[in-house]
From Swiss-Prot:
Pfam families the UniProt entry points to: GATase, GMP_synt_C, NAD_synthase
Protein name: GMP synthase [glutamine-hydrolyzing]
Keywords linked to the UniProt accession: ATP-binding, Glutamine amidotransferase, GMP biosynthesis, Ligase, Nucleotide-binding, Purine biosynthesis
Signal peptide: none
Species in which this protein is naturally found: Vibrio cholerae serotype O1 (strain ATCC 39315 / El Tor Inaba N16961)
Active-site residues (renumbered): C86 (nucleophile), H173, E175
Domain GMPS ATP-PPase: 200-392
């Protein structure tokens, strides 16, 4: 490796916008390493990070309010280029001598920005740009040493710049796809203004991760809880590439997986890629622990607790293992970082081996902790994992445990597995699978009357669920063709003995959540 992929870096200060992680993903997409920190970071931390440029994100607060967030003064004393986006532009203007006021007309949605003058930010772009606005306040006076470089009909200062100091501000969101040339603007800032090189690529990330794993664990043995999900699968491939047979994967079949999933995991990682895998058939143990429990959070906790017990027992048999590999990714790290003002993301309890007992006394190997999910998928492809595995729809950590409503029983799981497999198979056959963001089947523990032949029968009900979403924070139910839904329903009722009725969930998020439990 000729250059350290972390040598050139952008710091993004988070003021709370729903799009902030998207800014970071775009910078990574450009090929430059970046980190996302809360706006109230200490000067010493910025100095130590030593960024080549700083981006101030958007945010929900109003600069006109007392005690609203401000960028640390060091941002403007550091001598590095600064790019303020939406709220970031407003706080930049206010802090450097301009003025912000609440607008008479709020601007949400598409707008056209007329570019004026020549700016490095808009290099090689047309003089009219389609952009995405989302603001109630606006800059009404720019700082004395700034010039206007863009305006809309309702926003006189849609973009401003101090070319000498390399300070830029835009009132719109260049990070969203609705801003047609937003990525080019970010490229102009990151590559052009900040002078960064494209060192952050899938190949270089793999090379760096493998080198770091080797350095961290030396000749020690490592264990990994392999679920067959994207994160743990990519960790398995990376660690195996680094240390080969010194990695042992523990695959716990809890009886709550999709149809044939256990066999597929063993076949892919054991037979095809040659990893050491211990398969633990723990279906009976999990179902026994879940007996009589019908409350969703209690089910989650029970599944998590039993997984930890099983994994702990298996790890004790591997007495030489000194390291535990985990699939922690960058959004987990961001969510776990508490801001000193309490405004940062709260810690989320993830269903993974993060809850393992303290007495395991193992070091952690987390090769994905700098990566976003889309980056994890890209390096998974580079490592040889199949596309359809890396890009399949999300599956909850507790598995069918939260897709069987109420108490979980083997009979219910077996019926649900088969019904769900039919739904997914038909989505692929109709070329609809990649057109929806997530699709699955839910088992309802209620019997409904049906007619089969000359007789009536009371059998179970399942619900099909398919949604379209960009970020999973909000979602629309997918308008699947009636003919398609009819075909899926007929197949399930005819092929899965025990199901007499199929319904389709047409609830959006909000008010409903995507999963039923």
């Amino acid at each position: 490796m000729t250059k350290n992929i972390h040598d050139q870096r952008i710091l993004i200060l988070d003021f709370g916008s729903q799009y902030t992680q998207l800014v970071a993903r775009r910078v990574r997409e450009i090929g430059v390493y970046c980190e996302l920190w809360s706006w109230d970071v200490e000067e010493a931390d910025i100095r130590e990070f030593n960024p080549d440029g700083i981006i101030l994100s958007g945010g929900p607060e109003s600069v006109t309010e007392a005690n609203s967030p401000r960028a640390p003064q060091y941002v403007f004393d550091s001598g590095v280029p600064v790019f303020g986006v939406c709220y970031g532009m407003q706080t930049m203007a206010e802090q450097l001598g301009g003025r912000v006021a609440t607008s008479d007309e709020r601007e949400f949605g598409y707008a056209q920005v007329k570019i004026s003058g020549e700016s490095a930010l808009f290099k090689d772009l047309d003089l009219t740009q389609d952009v995405w606005m989302s603001h109630g306040d606006k800059v009404v006076e720019i700082p004395a040493d700034f010039v206007k470089i863009g305006e809309t009909d309702t926003c006189p200062y849609a973009a401003m710049a101090n070319e000498e100091k390399k300070y830029y501000g835009v009132q719109f969101h260049p990070e969203v796809t609705h801003t047609k040339n937003g990525l080019q603007m970010l490229e102009n800032f990151v590559l052009g203004v900040c002078g960064c090189e494209r060192l952050w690529t899938s190949e270089s990330i793999i090379e760096d991760a493998v080198a770091r794993i080797k350095e961290q664990v030396g000749n020690d043995e490592v264990i990994l809880g392999l679920s067959g999900g994207v994160d743990s699968s990519v960790v398995a491939m990376l660690v195996h590439r680094a240390i080969g047979s010194k990695l042992t994967c523990v695959f716990v079949d809890n009886g709550l997986l999709r149809l044939n999933e256990g066999e597929q995991v063993m076949e892919m990682f054991g037979d095809k890629f040659g990893l050491n895998i211990i398969k633990v058939d723990a279906e009976e143990r999990f179902l026994k622990a879940l007996e009589g429990i019908d409350e969703p959070e209690a089910k989650r906790k029970t599944i998590g607790r039993v997984f930890v017990e099983v994994f702990d027992e298996e790890s004790k048999k591997l007495s030489n293992a000194k390291w535990l590999a985990q699939g922690t990714i960058y959004p987990d790290v961001i969510e776990s970082a508490a801001s000193k003002t309490g405004k940062a993301h709260v810690i989320k309890s993830h269903h993974n081996v993060g809850g393992l007992p303290d007495d395991m006394k193992m070091g952690l190997v987390e090769p994905l902790r700098e990566l976003f999910k889309d980056e994890v998928r890209k390096i998974g492809l580079e490592l040889g994992l199949p596309y359809n595995m890396l890009y399949r729809h999300p599956f909850p950590g507790p598995g069918l445990g939260v897709r069987v409503l109420g108490e979980v029983k083997k009979e219910y799981c077996d019926l649900l597995r088969r019904a769900d497999a039919i739904f997914i198979e038909e989505l692929h056959a109709a070329d609809l699978y990649n057109k929806v963001s997530q699709a699955f089947t839910v088992f309802l523990p209620v019997r409904s009357v049906g007619v089969m032949g000359d007789g009536r029968k009371y059998d179970w009900v399942v619900s099909l669920r398919a949604v379209e979403t960009i970020d999973f924070m909000t979602a629309h139910w997918a308008h699947l063709p009636y003919e398609f839904l009819g075909k899926v329903s007929n197949r399930i009722i005819n092929e899965v003995n025990g199901i007499s009725r199929v319904v389709y969930d047409i609830s959006g998020k909000p008010p409903a959540t995507i999963e039923w439990e």
